Curated annotation (Swiss-Prot):
It comes from Saccharomyces cerevisiae (strain ATCC 204508 / S288c). The keyword Nucleus applies. The gene is ORC5. ATP binds at G37, Y38, S39, G40, T41, G42, K43, T44. Component of the origin recognition complex (ORC) composed of at least ORC1, ORC2, ORC3, ORC4, ORC5 and ORC6. Interacts with ORC6. Component of a cullin-RING ligase (CRL)-like complex composed of at least the cullin RTT101, a linker protein MMS1, and the potential substrate receptor ORC5. Interacts with RTT101 and MMS1. It comes from the Eukaryota. Present with 768 molecules/cell in log phase SD medium. Transmembrane segments: none annotated. One of its GO terms (biological process) is DNA replication initiation. This is Origin recognition complex subunit 5. It is found in: Nucleus.
């Protein structure tokens, strides 16, 4: 059966590959198909365009990242397949099977077999495509789990009228390399270059920006009456090109990041439009040049009073502020100390019993280094060292009166409770600290190594916001 190949910008080769692999005939359609490409390369978009262009192909979409682990994914497969078939063939009497009973892969095979048997009255065989969008984002994914999925078709009856076909979209090539011997058909989606990114953004966003209410409102305020839709489109296209040119070195070819900047900057760009410069791209750019000098994102404290950062009204309105909790700030400070201060100094700096030891043994030899450690890559450290230093520097304010019996019962150190690990997870999500593992991170595992991912200037700003003098901890080491 012939299939329709949709037109997708800069993805002609990929759509032709999909047309070769995906069809309504189960005899020529492979049981497993992989689409590999990094975020923002158009895997999901191209696949959706392909199925929209071929309505005779029946597909079920699942996103494993939303299901977290393998057991909910198994249950979601049973539930969605059963519902899809009932929707496609409402006249066939069927028995409902409880998807919550699917707790193991072999139970999924049993459930699918029972579901497919009910459709043996169909005249022709048909394909049901199960699309697992972002399969390698599953939290507890291991090498054995993917093997069970790609072998699932071998456990189902060959003469079944319903043939399930799996399509996986994945980000990392390192995951696929483990299964290279299985010879699974794979379609690669390379990154877009800067010209392709600009073209895609203009094609996808111009219409939306033209219809934005802030542009229409500005046109009415400035009493601009002699402007056509083509000229509105030129204004939007010029703005998108300026965003790409100004921030490409910051975002790379990440379409999602550029889209966020477009949404953030567009209302402010529109506010600079006047009757005199709307037809003059250069004049409009000069009037709004401050928008393209920075992302207007800064890390600062939202506090009031003497410690608040004083800014003028215009700068305050044109900026976003992100505030970390006190625990997150001290964890980040402790991470920097762990990455740039050698472990042999920990006892002399943080121990409360160093005063018992006399002489050089109390503090060790602290020789000024030839190269400032801040100019080097951060060192890796274990979670135990991070928590120990965090406990030593985190201020504990007792609620009881000093010297009272209640004060004796209070803890003198901050405990590594669930709140601490929640803040640690937040810092990892924000990429402020990094690990040697890309996913499935066990925050309590001694095998995981950590490192700080922010420069000295940011750490100094954060430490000043909590009145912590981090420079004292690097005396005679940092220049």
């Amino acid at each position: 059966m012939n299939v329709t190949t949709p037109e997708v910008a800069f993805r002609e080769y990929q759509t032709n590959c999909l047309a070769s692999y995906i069809s309504a005939d189960p005899d020529i359609t492979p049981s497993n198909l992989i689409l590999q490409g990094y975020s923002g390369t158009g895997k999901t978009y191209t696949l959706k365009k392909y199925f929209n262009a071929n309505p005779n192909l029946h597909a079920v979409w699942l996103e494993p990242v939303e299901l977290v682990s393998w057991k909910p994914l198994l249950q979601a497969i049973a539930r969605t397949v059963q519902y899809k078939l009932k929707t496609l063939y409402p006249n066939i009497p069927t028995t409902d099977y409880d998807p919550l009973q699917v707790e193991e892969p072999f139970l999924l095979v049993k459930t699918l077999h029972n579901i497919f048997v009910q459709y043996e009255s169909l005249q022709e065989k048909t394909c049901l495509f199960l699309i697992l969008d972002g399969f390698d984002s599953l939290q507890d994914l291991d090498a054995a789990l993917f093997n069970k999925y790609i072998k699932l078709n071998e456990l189902l009856p060959k003469d079944s009228k319903i043939n399930i076909k799996f399509i996986y979209t994945m980000l990392e090539t390192s995951f696929l390399q483990r299964y290279s011997t299985h010879c699974i058909p794979t379609v690669m989606f390379p990154r877009y270059n800067v010209d392709e990114v600009s073209t895609i953004l203009v094609m996808s966003r111009c219409g939306e920006l033209m219809e934005d209410s802030c542009l229409r409102k500005r046109i009415i305020e400035e009493q601009i009456t002699d402007c056509t839709d083509d000229q509105f489109q030129n204004v939007a296209a010029n703005f998108i090109h300026l965003i790409v040119q100004a921030f490409h070195s910051y975002t790379g070819n990440d379409i999602f990041a550029l889209n966020d900047l477009i949404d953030f900057k567009w209302p402010k760009y529109v506010s600079r439009i006047t009757k005199e410069n709307i037809f003059e791209p250069l004049a409009l750019y000069k009037s709004a040049i401050k928008l393209f000098l920075s992302t207007d994102d800064n890390l600062s404290e939202n506090g009031q009073g003497e410690s608040a950062i004083t800014t003028n009204r215009d700068d305050l309105e044109n900026s976003q502020t992100y505030d970390l909790s006190i625990i997150s700030k001290y964890l980040l400070i402790a991470s920097y100390i762990c990455s740039y201060l050698e472990p042999r100094y920990d006892a002399s700096i943080f121990s409360r019993k160093t005063r018992i030891i006399q002489g050089r043994a109390a503090y060790g030899r602290r020789k000024k280094k030839e190269v400032n450690p801040r100019y080097l890559q951060p060192s890796l450290f274990a979670i135990e060292r991070l928590l120990a230093i965090f406990q030593a520097i985190f201020p504990i304010q007792g609620k009881a009166e000093s010297g009272s019996l209640s004060a004796l019962r209070e803890e003198s150190l901050m405990k590594a409770n669930i709140e601490v690990f929640q803040n640690l997870s937040e810092l990892h999500t924000l990429k402020l600290i990094a690990t040697t593992m890309n996913k499935n991170i066990d925050y309590l595992s001694p095998k995981v190594r950590w490192k700080v991912n922010v420069p000295w200037e940011i750490i100094k700003e954060i430490s000043e916001s909590v009145h912590f003098n981090i420079s004292d901890y690097f005396s005679d080491i940092h220049e």
